[in-house]
Amino acid sequence: MRENKSNPELKIRSTERDYKYISRITGRYAGLSLVFLTAGIVLWTVMDIIFDACIDSWKADPELNNSSYMWNILIYAIPYTLYALAAGFLVTFFSVPNVRINIRKYRDIPAEMSYAPGEHIKGGQE
């Protein structure tokens, strides 16, 4: 088992597999970011066109006057939510490879433990 850990070919294959996985995942995040950004822009444009077309009839009827305020809020609330999702996926797109690199870099550093392995912790089951 010890020979496998020090085998350079296995390390190269493992690193190559990790690199392909990271590339695939970051590609998905970039795609989702683009999808949400496009959806936000298209939705805002369509809602703005509908608002401009219907505002005259809403102002004429006093009962529909409140719906113009609600529609005006929705014009901005929904697309900004999509923009926030796009920004989140974009940040994830840039941060995932860096996090993976740091995990890979510091994987061999042992964590500091307050007790020796195999030793019972005080207050635990004996």
Curated annotation (Swiss-Prot):
GO terms for cellular component: plasma membrane. InterPro entries: Plasmid_mob_TrbF. Signal peptide: none annotated. It is found in: Cell inner membrane. The chain crosses the membrane at residues 31-54, 71-98. It is a multi-pass membrane protein. It comes from the Bacteria. Keywords: Cell inner membrane, Cell membrane, Conjugation, Membrane, Plasmid, Transmembrane, Transmembrane helix. NCBIfam families: PRK13743.1. This is Protein TrbF. It comes from Escherichia coli (strain K12). The gene is trbF.
